[in-house]
Each structure stands twice: as C-alpha cells, then as structure tokens.
C-alpha cells in the first residue's frame, strides 16, 4: 500500500481497492489520505493558526524517542520541538482526522530537519552530527583516519518552521482536491497492516480486476 496515493486516486475515480503493508507508517498515511474529502478545512486552518502562535518553553526538556540507529539524528532544539509538538498533538482538542493529518506532517518533516538522509535501506549521516563527531574522536584516539566528510544538505531546517510549512502546503492541497473532486464517486478502500503473503490467500476467488504494485528492489527482502 505504501503511502496510499494509488488507493486515494482509485477512490477519487470510483474504484474500490484492497491493499496491504507491513509498515506502521502506511496506516498513518493511508488514513490521512483516505479522509481527504472528509476534512473540515476551517478546523485545519484553525489548528494551523494555533500552532503558529504556539512556542516551546525554554524549560521544555523532553526529547523525541530514538533507537540506536537514530541517536543524535537532530539538532538539540529540533529534538525537543518534535516531542513538544507530538505531546501537543495528542492532547489537543481537534478531531482525530486532524490529529492524524498533523502526525503525517510531522513524519514528513523529520528528514529535512535532521542530520540524516535516506540512502537505500541505510541512513547517510552528516559530518556535523554529534554521532559522527564522536565517532571521529574515537577514531583519532586510535590513530585512525576520520570518516569521509559528508553534507546531507546545506542547512538543517528548523523543525517548527518545517512542520508549519508542511501543514500549510497540505491544507492548500486539500482545498484544491475537495474543490475539484466534488463530483467524483466515492469508493471503498480496504486496508490491512500485514504482509500480502498472509492476506492474499484469504481473499475470495475472482474479486480482483487488476493489480498495481511497485517494481521489485534488489536489496529488499520482502519482494
């Protein structure tokens, strides 16, 4: 199912679709896109304006969770703001659709405000990151050469500005979609977070008229 774009286009064209994905992020993305005709645009604009007026207190000390591979992925301010806005998102008064959309915008903003870049299955790290700096210090202490210098982007973006800009762009896109798609027939999206290896055998025979899938990648075991 991926990010759900194919299912969304099918829905807007009146075509029922069935999809699967093993990644939890697909659930966030698909729910956000499947609700494109249901969003209350004044509510989303109000949420955006409230976020613009919201500033993280200097005393806020919580940081976004990490695993070993993402340790030190963000500048210190970004690391705190990402957790701050997630806390706000969870407890805000807006609808579940609006909350999920904001969550997707936060997720879409992670890479531009980090020291990392996705490279195949791996993360590429900027030489300015604390992780690389510390690794080079350890290498120098052992008489080894530093890691090759790498800049993933010229500027590591501010997480607050990035999230606000992402949400603003999404709201604009939703305005266009809702205006241009009012006459399109609604269709059903059936989605399960699981592997096609388990789910496809459970489908009744002769219910599919077509299959859309991404091309296989040599380095992906799940293909």
Stretch-by-stretch model annotation:
Residues 1-55, 169-205, 210-223:
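Conserved S-adenosyl-L-methionine
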Residues 2, 6, 10, 58-65, ...:
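Alpha-helical context
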Residues 12, 18-20, 24-112:
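Non-catalytic nucleic-acid substrate-recognition regions in nucleic-acid-modifying enzymes
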Residues 59, 73-76, 137, 146, ...:
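Intrinsic disorder/low-structure terminal segments
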Residues 82-85, 91-210, 218, 222:
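SAM-dependent nucleic-acid methyltransferase catalytic core
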């Amino acid at each position: 199912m991926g990010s759900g774009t194919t299912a969304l286009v099918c829905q807007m064209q009146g075509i029922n679709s069935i999809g699967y994905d093993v990644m939890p992020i697909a659930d966030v993305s698909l729910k956000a896109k499947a609700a494109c005709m249901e969003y209350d645009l004044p509510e989303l604009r109000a949420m955006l304006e409230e976020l613009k007026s919201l500033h993280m207190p200097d005393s806020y000390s919580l940081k976004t969770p990490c695993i070993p591979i993402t340790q030190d992925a963000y500048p210190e301010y970004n690391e705190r703001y990402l957790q701050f806005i997630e806390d706000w998102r969870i407890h805000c008064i807006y609808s579940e659709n609006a909350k999920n959309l904001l969550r997707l915008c936060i997720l879409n903003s992670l890479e531009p405000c980090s020291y990392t870049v996705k490279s195949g299955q791996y993360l590429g790290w900027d030489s300015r990151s604390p992780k690389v700096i510390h690794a080079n210090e350890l290498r120098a202490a052992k008489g080894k050469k530093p890691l090759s210098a790498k800049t993933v982007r010229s500027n590591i973006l501010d997480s607050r500005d990035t999230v606000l800009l992402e949400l603003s762009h999404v709201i604009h896109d939703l305005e266009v979609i809702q205006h241009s798609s009012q006459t399109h027939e609604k269709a059903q999206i059936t989605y399960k977070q699981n592997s096609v290896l388990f789910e496809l055998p459970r489908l009744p025979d002769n219910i599919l008229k077509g299959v859309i899938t991404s091309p296989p990648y040599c380095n992906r075991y799940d293909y």
